[in-house]
Amino acid sequence: MPSPRIRKMSLSRALDKYLKTVSVHKKGHQQEFYRSNVIKRYPIALRNMDEITTVDIATYRDVRLAEINPRTGKPITGNTVRLELALLSSLFNIARVEWGTCRTNPVELVRKPKVSSGRDRRLTSSEERRLSRYFREKNLMLYVIFHLALETAMRQGEILALRWEHIDLRHGVAHLPETKNGHSRDVPLSRRARNFLQMMPVNLHGNVFDYTASGFKNAWRIATQRLRIEDLHFHDLRHEAISRFFELGSLNVMEIAAISGHRSMNMLKRYTHLRAWQLVSKLDARRRQTQKVAAWFVPYPAHITTINEENGQKAHRIEIGDFDNLHVTATTKEEAVHRASEVLLRTLAIAAQKGERVPSPGALPVNDPDYIMICPLNPGSTPL
């Protein structure tokens, strides 16, 4: 029996058809749309599907891996190319069986770029403060989304898809009926997470946030560019949140997986070094409780300036930059240091009482007389 006749269709047309009939029903439709547009920029897109060989696919792979991402100035990652090849492979399988535009899948036999070990980008205290301040001043919705990501480890798509009818603020649970891995999930909401959500107009039903995926992506890009924060993806906040869960030392791996939605424990192995670091304090059983408490109350760098008050007299202003709006003013430098120490002590004590995270002390600029260390426990020892 003769083989069915091949229908001629260019790869570009096939990608369009795939997007309209197959990809549109997937959760990752938007991402496949972007990848399809990338592929269509290359000569391979003009070839008919039945004419494309493994050599053509390998050439496309190598060309992409040799290119520089104009947005980041870095080489295109292997993960990016691997996902583009996965799209092509899915397309060829559909076309071979259902459309009759090719007889083989040339992508299957081509070597794929290795899967990277994953990004390990941590959000610094300075970046967190700057982004928080920027979003609070510019857009309340972005402010809530940013902090909700850090409190819950939810993915961008999960946050943007939140609906009020799925949020129980009384019991502190957000229900995600559909997630990336195809399973529903209940996300525990900390007190801080609930407080952030309540900044939004609370309704009985409907979307919590109005952003589309592309709109939010653009807003995030603009914010990081204006603040000159390099190489920080929104998805890095999920990594940051999970890292903080491990650093708490009070949650086991299974509990963290239940919060984050990881179906495979292998995905959480990259965080085990954080767990080991936390176990040091538990192994040191002889450490006194006072030492644990004192660990909260460490010195912080502060900037001291001389200002002119309205009455014409000079005053001294001290600002502790690791905290938002933590500053004092006094007529003498000694009094300013004493007040700054008291305010810092009160701030740290309240955070310790509530179990809230505080920023780590930043670096003290070398040989800069305008910077001093403020000690919350012993203001008299603070160098002037």
From Swiss-Prot:
InterPro entries: CB (IPR044068), DNA_brk_join_enz (IPR011010), Integrase-like_cat_sf (IPR013762), Integrase_catalytic (IPR002104), Integrase_recombinase_N (IPR010998), TTHA1013/TTHA0281-like (IPR035069), Tyrosine_recombinase_XerCD (IPR050090). One of its GO terms (molecular function) is DNA binding. The keyword DNA-binding applies. The active site is at R155, K180, H235, R238, H262, Y271 (o-(3'-phospho-dna)-tyrosine intermediate). It holds the Pfam family Phage_integrase. SUPFAM superfamilies: DNA breaking-rejoining enzymes, TTHA1013/TTHA0281-like. Residues 118-284 form the Tyr recombinase domain. Gene3D superfamilies: 1.10.150.130, Intergrase catalytic core. GO terms for biological process: DNA integration; DNA recombination. Residues 9-96 form the Core-binding (CB) domain. Keywords: DNA integration, DNA recombination, DNA-binding, Plasmid. Belongs to the 'phage' integrase family. Shufflon-specific DNA recombinase. PANTHER family: INTEGRASE_RECOMBINASE HI_1414-RELATED, PHAGE INTEGRASE-RELATED. This is Shufflon-specific DNA recombinase. It comes from Escherichia coli. The lineage of its organism: Bacteria, Pseudomonadati, Pseudomonadota, Gammaproteobacteria, Enterobacterales.
